[in-house]
Amino acid sequence: MRVLEKAVDMLSVSYIGKPPQPRKFKIRFRDGTLKTIKVDQVKRVDSVTPAGHPNFVYYCYSEVDDKIVDYELRYFVKEMRWELYRVYE
């Protein structure tokens, strides 16, 4: 497991009364390359409020370079910001 806490550009869909649903995101790697990752499935969404700051935690997986990758995305409600928080290996 790697904790990244890396900001990502996200394309998401919003429905009335539900948290935003991630569809795909772009991430920039250390070498400067930019990769688009399609969110294949959201397995679970948790609503958490650490220190009074509401956010949603998404447990997802995607097929990346012919491998299944499990990861955790976070959406910070007050900041309207997405983050790739953790990658499970």
Identify the meaning behind each predicted range.
Residues 1-89:
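Cysteine-centric segments in proteins
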